[in-house]
Amino acid sequence: LDYYKDKKEIWILRRALFAIEDMEKMLNRLKNELKKAKAGKLHFPKVPRWTGEERPIIEGPSFIAPAKTPNSPSRMRPVFFNGYGAFDQVKADIEKFPNYGVNIIQIEFGPVDIFPKEDEVSDSAIKEMLTILDRAKKVGVAVNLLISPHYFPKWMLEKYPHLRKKREGFLDYCLHAPESKELLLRYIKIIIPPLKDHPSLHSICLTNEPVNVEEPCEYALRDWHIWLAQKHGDISTLNRRWGSNYSSFEEIPLPNPFSSLYDIQTPLGMDYVLFNQEWFAGWHKMLADAIHEIAPDLPVHAKAMTWTLTGTGEVDLGVDAELFSSFSQINGNDSVNFYSHGVGEFAQGWIGNLLPYDLQRSVKDIPIFNSENHIIPDREARYIPPAHIRCALWQQAVYGQSATTIWIWGRTYDLRSDSAGSIMHRPLCAEAVGIVNYDLNRLSEYVREIQRIKPQVHIIMSNSAKVWDGGHYSDCLDKLYTALTFSGVKIGFVTERQLERGEIPQTKIIFIPNMAHISDRAFEALKNFKGKIVIVGEVELLSKNEYDQKREDKLTGERLIYRYGETTWQDIWSSLRPRLRDWGIQPPIEVFDNKSRPLWGVAFLCAPTKYGTLVNLSNYRNERVELKLRTKEGSFAIDLLSNEKISLDPLPLNPLEVRLLLLKKR
């Protein structure tokens, strides 16, 4: 206890000193800015703000809504929503948030609030929500409601003991049983009608960090057998594909993820992964359909953890980006990007945002809403520079995020709390959120052009490769993605399911990242691809089907060397850059260091637009760089963030500094 007390006092003192230093910097800067403004040497940019009068409509990656600039009428334009979640403090501070530069919150309630007892229905949570929506509308703050099916009434578990199932994650009851489904549908029928038409209700988040890991039950077993019959048609076809000898579908067990015998690297395990993904998406669709039966135009999404969308170790959790997009009007997620404190080659964990964002945008061109944006670790005691916050939020937006609520707006003296060390303890970080939101909204029409860049290349995202090839596949994919990012290439993904449906991307290149396995139907579709196939790896790739059966047929293509455990992303980058030109992939600009060598660590994207050529730059390195931009478009640029005319040689970039340039000719 004495140790804890001393540690707590040290932590509180350090936090106070950080905050004082931050606020002194803010005060001194503001004094200088006001002095310049008074002398006519500085003009603060005008920022359009969402009026709160109409719910945004969705156009591609954008939320389009009425926004008003001071002394001007409101007009429809792209609006970015940046704010906070998730509990009592965001409710209390709604009226303060516009002055902090933010315009959205996420809050929640669940079935237990509506059904506290078996024979009681309470409308208290609905009344509180309506009051919050009214307050938010007055000040132009949007509200995302997480309907939290994980807040499930205990009396239901007592009344229906079979709902008690061993599970992972927030949803801790049997999802397959009809009793749990019926309660959730009744819950939706009660809460949606009084809320659905409020303009401040931005959207509905269906679930919090969903995963479907459950011990088998009779209902899941029944659904499993139905799915197998629909997929294979007859048991002899299944036996041929699996290399098995079952006499009927009913004989096939449903895998138990908690069993010591659980193994997805079998034909049965492969099909279980696909079944679990499709079933869980269908369960979400049940909730979405119930909402849309009452409110057809109310957007919904789910807060899927991005690593469950991309990771090989998470492929069996039931979460699939493409299937989740099918019931969503917004690509929802929960994503992580932490400051590195100088450890490693990059200043922040950027790939954890950008790669899954590109995946989500590839399966459905709708806005991304990261409704639990982890940009500061829980209980973080170290200082976080505001540049980390600014870079993370800006780049997330550039890659398609048009709404986000940051975890977490709360303050505490309890070191064990998730709120310890949160952004509410960090004045310059909180200020950075507001400034980024202002910049995104005043430049929203430019940022939208960057968001709309069409992929120039595609990478295959394959469940078969995730199951059978594991880290050999994901390691290559991550390194390839990194190399392409620092080559100025807009990256897309094509999924195995898309290929199976014959949806072949209209692009010049498809990359195959060290994957031996792909489904037979996807393989056949690749034969019809008109562009160039680039194989990244040494071994014979695409040599087996989804059930690990050897494939005699082969695909030919270009090859990049990759050896698992040896090849770095820089190795791929060095060999990739010159070959991209040969393959017809040439960004409008090239980035070099001050010695005219290719420069790694600076992510850049270019968009030819009606305004001119836009260039977005972000320095992910731990050190300042001086770069040169080579372009045919012009010899200088306007930095749209600072509204300054700048030279393209040299162009300094501090760690985690972002720039949005508009190229100009002299």
Label each residue range with its predicted role.
Residues 25-104:
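N-terminal carbohydrate-binding accessory modules
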Residues 5-53, 76-78, 339-666:
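Carbohydrate-binding surfaces of carbohydrate-active enzymes
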Residues 80-84, 105-107, 143-147, 202-206, ...:
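Hydrophobic faces of well-ordered beta-strands that scaffold small-molecule active sites
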Residues 78-87, 108-126, 166-185, 207-214, ...:
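The substrate-binding groove and active-site-proximal loops of carbohydrate-active enzymes
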Residues 86-99, 184-190, 312-324, 385-393, ...:
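Short, acidic/polar
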Residues 91-166, 286-294:
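Aromatic-lined substrate-binding rim segments of carbohydrate-active enzymes
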